[in-house]
Amino acid sequence: MEDKNQTVVTEFLLLGLTDHPYQKIVLFFMFLFVYLITLGGNLGMITLIWIDPRLHTPMYFFLRHLSFVDICSSSSVVPKMLCNIFAEKKDITFLGCAAQMWFFGLFEAAECFLLAAMAYDRYVAICKPLLYTLIMSQQVCMQLVVGPYAMALISTMTHTIFTFCLPFCGSNIINHFFCDIFPLLSLACADTWVNKFVLFVLAGAIGVLSGLIIMVSYICILMTILKIQTADGKQKAFFTCFSHLAAVSILYGTLFLIYVRPSSSSSLGIYKVISLFYTVVIPMVNPLIYSLRNKEVKDAFRRKIERKKFIIGR
C-alpha cells in the first residue's frame, strides 16, 4: 500500500468573485443594497399580510412563508459573502461550510415545493371556486407548508451528509463565493459519482414533482380561463396567476441550469453568475413581483399608508 502524506482539511478558503479593488467596492455596495431591499421587501410583505385581515387567506398564507424562505436563503449566503469581499483571508470552517450548504439547500428546496403548493391553491381558487374554502382549510394549508419543509429537510440532509463524509485531504480552496455542492465535490479525495448521482436524482425529483404539480395545475387553470365568456373575467383570472408564473419561471430556470444540466456544459464564470442570480437576485425580486402585479397587496399597502396619515393628522 502506498503511504501518502495527506493533510486533513479543517477549513475552506473561498476565492469569491474578484480580486480587483475597485470591483470589490462596487460589488460590496451593490450586493448590500440588494440584500437590504430583500430584507425590507420580504419583511414588509410578511408584516403586511400579518396585520391586514383581508389578506388572511390561503394564498397569502403561502406567500408569507415564501417571503420567509427568501429571507432565510439569502441570509445564509449574502452576509458571509459581504464580509469576505474585503477580507484578507476568506476562510470558512468545515462545520460552517456544512451549515451554509445545509441551510441554503433547505430553503431553496422548500421554495420549490411552496411554489407548487401555491399553484395548487390557484387551481382550486379558479377551477373550483365554490369548494375553495372547504378544500383549502386551515389544516390543509398547514400540511401544504409543513410538507415542503419536511421534504426539503430530507433532501438537503442527504446531500450534506453524503458530501461532508467524503475525505478532503488536498486543496481547501473553493473557487466560488459560498459553499455550494459542486465546487466542494471537486475538492474531495475520493470518487464522487455516487454523490453526483444522488444529487441528480433528488434535485431532479424535486424539480419534476413540484414542476408536474405546477404544470398540471396551470393546464387546468388555462382550460378554465378559456371557458370564461367575458374578457374582464379572463383578464382577472390571468392576472391572479401572472405573479406566480413569473416567480416559477425565474426560479426553475436558474435552478435547472445549475443542478440538472451536465456539469461541463458551462464555464465556471457563467456558473457563478447564475449562482448570484438565484442567491441574491431572486429573493429580492419575488416580493416586487407579488406586490407590483397584485391589486390586493397594493390596496392593503395603500390602506395602511392612508391610516397612518390619518392618525398623524389627528
UniProtKB/Swiss-Prot annotation:
Record localization: Cell membrane
Keywords, comma-separated and alphabetical: Cell membrane, Disulfide bond, G-protein coupled receptor, Glycoprotein, Membrane, Receptor, Transducer, Transmembrane, Transmembrane helix
Protein name (database record): Olfactory receptor 5G3
Residue positions the entry lists as glycosylated: 5
Main localization, broad class: membrane
Ranges in the topological domain labelled Extracellular: 1-24, 119-143, 189-196, 259-268
Function: Odorant receptor.
Organism in which the protein naturally occurs: Homo sapiens
InterPro entries: GPCR_Rhodpsn, GPCR_Rhodpsn_7TM, Olfact_rcpt
Membership in a protein family: Belongs to the G-protein coupled receptor 1 family.
GO cellular component: plasma membrane
GO molecular function: G protein-coupled receptor activity; odorant binding; olfactory receptor activity
Ranges per topology, Cytoplasmic: 46-97, 165-167, 218-237, 290-314
PROSITE patterns according to UniProt: G_PROTEIN_RECEP_F1_1 (PS00237), G_PROTEIN_RECEP_F1_2 (PS50262)
Transmembrane regions listed in the UniProt entry: 25-45, 98-118, 144-164, 168-188, 197-217, 238-258, 269-289
Disulfide bonds: 97-179
Secretion signal, residue range per the UniProt entry: none
Membrane topology of the entry: Multi-pass membrane protein
